[in-house]
């Protein structure tokens, strides 16, 4: 076996790819949760409204069940009232492993050649391929001992850069792979953490999907932290609706939470990344993150679309051992990086 490849810790390499600088300094983001019975929320009091019963969004096109689609649900072709579709991809063009970057260069920026979030893995374009109508991020450790990671940034009209509001949907699932995690996130175009970070979904591969909204005034802290009932091991469509007044979060077209806290005001772009957690993954750990399709909508000219709301207003159900009315000091939540 050859020597292990040392991941680059050059922050500029990450910035050049639209990645958070945290990728260049080894900050873990997909740390596995502490396992406790029940679900937990960790939020500032009143910051997050949880849907008492998940309710279909009123602005989005209902999912269309399609048994011929790789995930069983086809990519929506309509963008809903008040929104305009500016990006959509269903990965119909197949590639060899490692051939994705060249084949999709007009549609995606691909992470390559720098350290992943935990600082132990390395982003490589070679982990990416498109086959059978899905994007496959194949995570594994090289013979030299380097864990490989994958990351993509959609390019709207072939151009790099984000939005100041939008609706972002990705349909994905993953294998359960020890030592690896995934995050779909909104990240600052200027790579300034204080501009905001919104992670949904986020979590260890094959584990529960988490929602994390980092506090604008102190981004190392999370103003919203919530474990959903969805498993990353199953096909689900995850949607972030971001408006100036509110952010809402949907799974399979149903609202699971909404917040008015720490809403970004700067330009943000969508990232989907999968890499190692804290420490080195087991050498034999290997598996895939699969993405069936992804879409980006922006407000139509002259329109001010509203983020979707759950029914029942601010009434939140019991979540694990406490409710949204429980004082923050009484909360006990598992931590996800």
Question: What label would you give each PLM region?
Answer:
Residues 1-38:
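Terminal targeting segments of Actinobacterial cell-envelope proteins
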Residues 7, 59-62:
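N-terminal compositionally biased, intrinsically disordered segments and leader/signal-like regions
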Residues 16-17, 58-59, 66:
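Generic N-terminal simple sequence motifs
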Residues 28-30, 38-40, 50, 62-337:
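GH16 jelly-roll
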Residues 44-47:
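Sec-dependent N-terminal signal peptides
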Residues 49-59:
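Hydrophobic alpha-helical membrane-insertion segments, chiefly the h-region
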